[in-house]
């Protein structure tokens, strides 16, 4: 009997897979536990619609991430910070600070988890990586200027 998996099942397959299962296994194990449903024409149609909608949504997210990457590419952020001897900062600049400054200066909302950088503790120029989507990333320049 052909069944559509509704959840990942160890050693059987992943959610959305269409597998061949024995009648007893399907009726006595998979169906009662809501792990699978019969692969009827109606259920296959629903599955295909879900997969198509997911594909369209991922494509839209990818396009939005690429557009955002183009907007941010080559931009820079200047931060004035109090420094001590040798340009060492009092405190540090983190990805949270950079995300807030991007929001303030460019009106673009970016999650701090998407900003890949080490904590900045010295004045100077730094290049940070922003991973907007698994295959879309961009670079920005952060300049730390000592406060007078």
UniProtKB/Swiss-Prot annotation:
Pfam families attached to this UniProt entry:
Ribosomal_L9_C, Ribosomal_L9_N
- Supply the HAMAP family for this chain: Ribosomal_bL9
Which InterPro entries does its entry note? Answer: Ribosomal_bL9, Ribosomal_bL9/RNase_H1_N, Ribosomal_bL9_bac/chp, Ribosomal_bL9_C, Ribosomal_bL9_C_sf, Ribosomal_bL9_N, Ribosomal_bL9_N_sf
| GO molecular function per UniProt | rRNA binding; structural constituent of ribosome
The UniProt family comment states:
Belongs to the bacterial ribosomal protein bL9 family.
Q: What is the lineage of its organism?
A: Bacteria, Bacillati, Bacillota, Clostridia, Eubacteriales
State what protein this is by name: Large ribosomal subunit protein bL9
Q: Source gene?
A: rplI
For this UniProt record, the keywords arranged alphabetically read as follows: Ribonucleoprotein, Ribosomal protein, RNA-binding, rRNA-binding
Q: What does this protein do?
A: Binds to the 23S rRNA.
Q: What are its GO cellular component terms? A: ribonucleoprotein complex; ribosome
What's any GO biological process attached to this entry?
A: translation
């Amino acid at each position: 009997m052909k069944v559509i998996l509704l959840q990942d099942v160890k050693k059987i397959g992943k959610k959305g897979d269409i597998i061949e299962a024995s009648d007893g296994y399907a009726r006595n194990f998979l169906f009662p536990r809501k792990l699978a449903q019969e692969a009827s024409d109606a259920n296959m149609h629903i599955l295909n619609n879900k997969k198509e909608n997911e594909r369209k949504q991922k494509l839209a997210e990818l396009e939005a991430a690429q557009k955002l990457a183009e907007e941010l590419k080559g931009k820079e952020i200047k931060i004035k910070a109090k420094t001590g001897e040798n340009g060492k900062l009092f405190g540090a600049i983190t990805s949270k600070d950079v995300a807030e400054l991007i929001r303030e200066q460019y009106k673009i909302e970016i999650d701090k988890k998407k900003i890949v950088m080490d904590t900045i503790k010295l004045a100077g120029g730094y290049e940070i990586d922003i991973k907007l989507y698994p295959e879309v990333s961009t670079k920005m320049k952060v300049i730390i200027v000592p406060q007078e």
